[in-house]
Amino acid sequence: MRLFYRLLKQPVPKQIERYSRFSPSPLSIKQFLDFGRDNACEKTSYMFLRKELPVRLANTMREVNLLPDNLLNRPSVGLVQSWYMQSFLELLEYENKSPEDPRVLDNFLNVLINIRNRHNDVVPTMAQGVIEYKEKFGFDPFISSNIQYFLDRFYTNRISFRMLINQHTLLFGGDTNPAHPKHIGSIDPTCNVADVVKDAYETAKMLCEQYYLVAPELEVEEFNAKAPNKPIQVVYVPSHLFHMLFELFKNSMRATVELHEDKKEGYPAVKTLVTLGKEDLSIKISDLGGGVPLRKIDRLFNYMYSTAPRPSLEPTRAAPLAGFGYGLPISRLYARYFQGDLKLYSMEGVGTDAVIYLKALSSESFERLPVFNKSAWRHYKTTPEADDWSNPSSEPRDASKYKAKQDKIKSNRTF
């Protein structure tokens, strides 16, 4: 423990600096699948992870130190840093240990499980730090931009880190889910999209009914351009897709119920369209919940703009549909992680269409990973420049006063 605290106090421990010089190695869903299905070898996985996991940790740990000091000094942020440092040091112990020793493989597996459990609360803990910072120091556009940039990369790194750990522990830990025997780790080779849609809807519906006592119905339509009249399937991580869909259904239900609660005709259904083309698998969720003004769309994905109240520390007092306001930005990161995206199209006064885009081919679904390099460093160090587009002032200029002022200047020059 003395070594741990000594390293934590150093500006940049040498091992972190060394590993951060390497770029992460992005894998495709097909590579995950092929390894787990055809030639799953625990020794090979161990040899890869004992290098790759420290590289991914080191890249994000170097970037953390570029955040404003006032944010780094928040207790919650310090706690997250300590978790990352501890996990990094535990992984370093296996840097040179031979995979031929079965005890090494068993111990490494247990270390990965402990690390995963330790990092379970990284998102809410870091969110707490951002809230503490915002409450004490207010909102600054430049710092907010840097925090947005960092958190997108930080949380993406966390998604990828857990993906690697989950694949190893599920393949070699003997904790395969009997309900999904065909899964390769956390990947479903034949993920039925409509089934995940319905599961996410039912979970969101349960919460909506628990809080509002009612919930809109669901209408699902499929259009398979590759194989007409057949169910749409994709090689994907069902838990990732569920996370995105649940968040979107939750938002649609809340908006729909609150807008139509006093209307006699009831609640309009939430409609879902699933389509599969040559390149993209798209899922559109449409509601009639009143929509959002265009100027607010970007704010829905901004960590610093969240209008959600600070969540209660007592679970019994927390509203089921409340949180840190991170649901949409994190969901978009899940979509982008394997080269997809999540977009919102809203018509104020009517409703919102939320579209999830995924790659149709697993060979094109490569991890999208943040890399710590000079470009990333410059993003934090570059000072904001003047806007090169006009900005409307808060009050329109009175042309008559301006003209009178110019006439007075001219008359003074005459004398």
Curated annotation (Swiss-Prot):
Where is the protein found, in the record's own terms? Answer: Mitochondrion matrix
The reaction(s) this protein catalyses? L-seryl-[pyruvate dehydrogenase E1 alpha subunit] + ATP = O-phospho-L-seryl-[pyruvate dehydrogenase E1 alpha subunit] + ADP + H(+)
UniProt keyword Transit peptide present: yes
Compositionally biased residues, Basic and acidic residues: 395-415
N6-succinyllysine occurs at: 278
For the region Disordered, what residue ranges are annotated? 383-415
Task: Tell me which Gene3D superfamilies the record gives.
Answer: Alpha-ketoacid/pyruvate dehydrogenase kinase, N-terminal domain, Histidine kinase-like ATPase, C-terminal domain
Sorted alphabetically, which keywords does the UniProt record give? ATP-binding, Kinase, Mitochondrion, Nucleotide-binding, Transferase, Transit peptide
The residue ranges of the Histidine kinase domain are: 131-362
What is said about its interaction partners and assembly?
Homodimer. Interacts with the pyruvate dehydrogenase complex subunit DLAT, and is part of the multimeric pyruvate dehydrogenase complex that contains multiple copies of pyruvate dehydrogenase (E1), dihydrolipoamide acetyltransferase (DLAT, E2) and lipoamide dehydrogenase (DLD, E3).
Family of this protein:
Belongs to the PDK/BCKDK protein kinase family.
- State what protein this is by name: [Pyruvate dehydrogenase (acetyl-transferring)] kinase isozyme 3, mitochondrial
